[in-house]
């Protein structure tokens, strides 16, 4: 039912994998350029159309989708429940990067700025969906980290089977990062 409303934007810009802090900055720039390429798929968007800016592992609930379909008048921040490794492992703080915005406001800026640098949240939808972080087996996690913008996480001290398995057992982040609201 949605096939005619989904657009695939080919992003061919290439950037080498970072090997240094300067490289990480360049890699973050690639991630930014990739997200901003969303605009290429919106060439015929109408001012009142709602644009949702989510990563592939950020899944809105059916209720949130229905709310967004009714339209928005302002930038809306979506608080997703954070899950690590499996759906049963809940991290006790909201994931707050997903946003939805009317196209008329988006075209004044960029998708990446809206996602990361928007001034205080204008409107918030709580319990809007799920962020499924680092799902999959250890090899899948390592593949993700190999192309991750935070390339410092792709370090053997974090990516060994022993560390990844222990992190699952202990219910902690594999890099022992502390989370909070």
Give the location of each predicted region.
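Active-site acidic Asp-centered loop
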Residues: 54-55
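SAM cofactor-binding core of SAM-dependent methyltransferases
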Residues: 1
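Catalytic-site signature of metal-activated, phosphate-bearing donor transferases
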Residues: 4-11, 18-44, 59-181
């Amino acid at each position: 039912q949605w096939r005619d409303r989904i657009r695939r934007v080919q992003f061919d810009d290439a950037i080498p994998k970072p090997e240094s802090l300067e490289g990480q900055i360049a890699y973050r720039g690639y991630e930014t350029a990739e997200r901003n390429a969303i605009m290429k798929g919106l060439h015929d968007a109408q001012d009142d159309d709602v644009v949702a800016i989510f990563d592939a592992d950020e899944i809105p609930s059916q209720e949130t989708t229905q709310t967004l379909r009714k339209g928005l008048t302002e930038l809306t921040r979506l608080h997703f429940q954070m899950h690590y490794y499996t759906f049963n492992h809940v991290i006790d703080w909201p994931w707050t990067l997903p946003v939805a915005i009317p196209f008329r406001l988006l075209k004044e800026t960029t998708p990446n700025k809206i996602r990361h640098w928007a001034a205080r949240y204008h409107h918030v939808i709580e319990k809007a969906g799920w962020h499924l972080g680092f799902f999959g087996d250890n090899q899948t996690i390592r593949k993700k980290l190999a192309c991750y913008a935070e390339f410092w996480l792709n370090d053997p001290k974090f990516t060994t089977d022993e560390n990844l398995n222990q992190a699952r057992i202990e219910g902690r982040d594999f890099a022992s990062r502390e989370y909070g609201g």
